[in-house]
């Protein structure tokens, strides 16, 4: 899958695309994402580096935004909105209360392209991997 990452620039927004993301390691994805974001900010992206893509990720959490709904940018079929990680009280399985880091994720899908149930499965998997990052190393 080709994944677009929203990058704020001085005059607006670019969505550079990481090609064949599913075939890359987490460290390779991170490196490529940083390189593309820097190219976007320095206005050195080539058209083939921001055109296309099927899925977008927008992280306003880095600006302290807790929760938001992102708008799908065609031709993408879905976009994941990532909110800030905040310390919040949670109830553990043994009914004790603890402070934990919690973040919000909101997935918007174009139902002409992606069935809502498939979107829900995607959210389950994203949540599973974020709650237990060691699974991403396998």
Regions found by a protein language model. Give the residues of each.
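C-terminal catalytic/motor cores of large multi-domain enzyme assemblies
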Residues: 1-138
